[in-house]
Amino acid sequence: TILGTGDIGCHVAQRMRSMGAAKIIGLSRSGKSREAVYDALYPIGDLDAVLCETELLVMALPDTAQTRGMLDRRRIALLPRQALVINVGRGTAIEQEALADALNEGRLSGAALDVAVPEPLPADNPLWTAKNLILTPHISGNMTLGYTCDANVEMFCTDLANYAAGRPLVHLVDRARGY
């Protein structure tokens, strides 16, 4: 299950498909995705029902008022014991203390967080000692790789050319949505 079906979520879905994932479910605000990489798509309102059946939850959410604390203690409890949680979006989407508790009590199989709040985590943060947790320092995006830099330059150049020609920009931030 991929929570967030934007560019990052779609990229994760494509990678999962190439590794033979049996069923890839996506959840988004609208229950839609720009790319046809999911076996099923649901609106965020169905999150609780989907979590009960989720073995692998990949979170690729932006930081908005709607996503902050989305995976809270109550929702973590909905996940099966064998579930794994991966967060590559924003650290604010997970109630970190609840995640650490669930891992330490064996209510989740494991987790991997590339993002947390704050970054870097203080030495006394309970995530450092949580069982079956992998922490990485916000590096999953590989922003230093050549193809990532090339893609960023290409996006900028496309919008610059559109701006100069009086055409609509492609890569706009919707301030009301927060991303």
Label every PLM stretch briefly:
Residues 1, 78, 134:
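Conserved beta-strand segments that form the floor/walls of ligand-binding pockets within enzyme
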Residues 9, 32-33, 142, 179:
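Flexible, glycine-rich phosphate/dinucleotide-binding loops
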Residues 22, 31-126:
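Rossmann-like adenosine-cofactor binding region
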Residues 24-26:
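Short beta-strand "acidic-cap" motif of Rossmann-like dinucleotide-binding folds
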